[in-house]
């Protein structure tokens, strides 16, 4: 279990804000930090990793104190059993894929670990290649593989898939989910993609101006729990067109474009680019902005 009770003042585009977190993260959870840029999401990841220091508070992981402002305890990053994957994969350009993994190996005598991770991440065919010859998706798979070489208890993911196309993004989301389950890791992801949150997470912290405003499952945080229906889909509004007394919405959901009809009252607060929840009741679609 990760016990966080920290405070840090941040300088943002909105001025100074206080990042205040008093939460517990359970072992094996897949938690997403969701919110606007500058809300404190990445800073919280960096604080957990030991790359930034809170002004006050405490971080306890299991029975080990990682940070305690009163006791003057602050474990350096190399003593915290975490893996960190950034949007920028940060691979060593002069090393092959195998070389990047071997460099991260704690026990240099255990080369079998490299082969195991290459197989799990399905990148064995890339082992002799250097990063410059890899696609964006391949580089991120190697970055995740390199992180797994250290056997981390906690996997910190700072928008690692945001620069990828939708097809590769979906594939790597599945791979992250498999890695999370297979290794029993506690994962913390920063993401702006609601569909990604639903695919990966069992818990969400919604953060605004340094404060956690919502804490719950993706459905609890993003969807109106008063809505009942046979199904619920998250999508992005691509277009809104008037047709007689109705409106036709084109919505991108799960990499597919679907069309939904609605009356004016259904879409009064909905505009192009909004994320919406589509649910169905008695064959009638219900649209809810989220």
Language model region names:
Residues 65-83:
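ABC ATPase NBD coupling module
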Residues 215-216:
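ABC ATPase "signature
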Residues 149-153:
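A short, proline-enriched helix->beta-strand linker immediately N-terminal to the Walker B motif
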Residues 130-134, 138-140:
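Conserved ABC ATPase signature
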Residues 155-159:
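Catalytic Walker B motif of ABC-type/P-loop ATPase nucleotide-binding domains
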Residues 64-68, 109-126, 178:
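Conserved ABC ATPase "signature" region
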């Amino acid at each position: 279990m990760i016990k966080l009770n920290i405070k840090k003042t941040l300088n943002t585009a909105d001025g100074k804000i206080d990042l205040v977190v008093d939460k517990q993260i359970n072992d094996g959870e897949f938690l997403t930090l969701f919110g606007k840029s500058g809300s404190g999401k990445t800073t919280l990841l960096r604080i957990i990793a030991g790359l930034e220091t809170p002004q006050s508070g405490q971080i306890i992981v299991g029975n080990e104190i990682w940070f305690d402002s009163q006791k003057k305890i602050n474990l350096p990053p190399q003593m915290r059993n975490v893996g960190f994957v950034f949007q920028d994969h940060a691979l060593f350009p002069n090393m092959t894929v195998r070389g990047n993994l071997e460099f991260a190996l704690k026990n240099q005598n255990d080369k079998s670990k490299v082969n195991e991770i290459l197989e799990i991440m399905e990148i064995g065919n890339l082992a002799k290649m250097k990063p410059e010859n890899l696609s964006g998706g391949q580089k991120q798979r190697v970055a995740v593989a390199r992180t797994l070489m250290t056997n981390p208890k906690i996997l910190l993911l700072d928008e690692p898939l945001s620069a990828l196309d939708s097809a590769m993004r979906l594939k790597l989301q599945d791979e992250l989910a498999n890695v999370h389950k297979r290794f029993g890791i506690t994962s913390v992801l920063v993401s702006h993609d609601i569909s990604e949150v639903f695919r990966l997470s069992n818990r969400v912290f919604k953060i605004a101006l340094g404060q956690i405003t919502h804490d719950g499952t993706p459905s609890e945080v993003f969807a109106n729990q008063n809505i009942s229906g046979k199904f619920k889909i998250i999508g992005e509004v691509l277009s809104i067109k008037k047709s007689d007394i109705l409106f036709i919405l084109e919505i991108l959901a799960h990499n597919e474009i679907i069309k939904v009809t609605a009356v004016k009252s259904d879409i009064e607060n909905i505009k192009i680019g909004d994320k919406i929840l589509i649910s169905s009741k008695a064959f009638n679609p219900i649209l809810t902005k989220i």
